[in-house]
Amino acid sequence: MSRPHGIPLPSARRSSDSNETESAFDDDKQGQPRPREGVRQLTGAERVRTLVESNASVSLTLPGARDCRAFDEFGTGMPVARTVTPDGDVILLVSGESAAARAAAHAQDDDLTAVIEITDVAPVSVPHRIRGRARLTGWLTPVRGDDRPACAALLAERRPAAGLPAPDGPPEPPYAVSPAWTMLRLEVGEITLDDLWGAEHVEPEALAAAEPDPMAAHETELLQHLYAAHGDRLGTLCGLVGARGAEHLTAVPLALDRLGLRIRFTGGAAGPFDARFDFPEPVADICGLRRAVHTLFSAAAH
């Protein structure tokens, strides 16, 4: 087995290609470090799927729609749960009294354009804390008829405490008698992603085929634990990237997935920089992740 090492991730530069999607994290805007070509990473579709299935902050907006109760433009607030169907549609659990629920019920079979925006924030305090944003645009409809039990089961699996009815509950329209919640379906037409790895467009078909990263459910807890209890050991990882003046740097765990751990080093004269530490092999569960992190620490100690 080869000795683990870190891969420094230099800051991005604005692309000279006018057709390339501009990043919200360009150097002159955010100073967000970016990767070199060839670094092991999840695909864009996997990263979007992971964000959709995560607890990251989300907003649902109906561009140009107007609430029949208040004659101004509205956003709908935050869905309390969300998941993705095998066909790639996004199922949202929202308040039955929300503007989105009322608008979808009123639209019937008309196209109702909607936008989901997901903002991913690092769970530890670090410069440039926003790790990424995903934007999914499509058409919003109520979940009706025979689709309701299957969608309710998917949401219940994602958020068991969300107060969903049994999957075999009554299939009548969810907007009768002002229920506490309702399910909406977003048929995705366009996806854009801007995160630590770069800015790109993702095809809706790729989202349907992708799986969320298995470490996403554990990432927040593990990063916070590493930061609080193992800050000194994280600092030793700087030796694996050959950085000068390592004794003056502070190491903050920024992100992890099944392929590796990303550390942001701060306090240097040149400003913060990131390093990516690949695991010897992809990890599938928490036990494998602990072994992989231990391997990194052991390599840094020798």
Language-model region placement:
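Short amphipathic beta-strand starts and helix->beta connectors
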Residues: 76, 121-122, 258-261
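Short, structured beta-strand-loop surface elements
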Residues: 87-88, 96-162, 271-274
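An N-terminal domain-cap segment
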Residues: 3-8, 27-104
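Short, surface-exposed beta-edge/turn micro-motifs
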Residues: 55-58, 87-89, 111-113, 180-183, ...
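Conserved hydrophobic/aromatic beta-strand scaffold that supports enzyme active sites
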Residues: 57-59, 133-137, 183-185
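Short, structured patches in soluble enzyme cores that scaffold and shape functional sites
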Residues: 94-96, 118-120, 140, 185-190, ...
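C-terminal edge-of-domain segments
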Residues: 1-31, 151-302
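A general structural signal for short secondary-structure junctions and capping/turn motifs
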Residues: 49-52, 82, 105-108, 126-127, ...
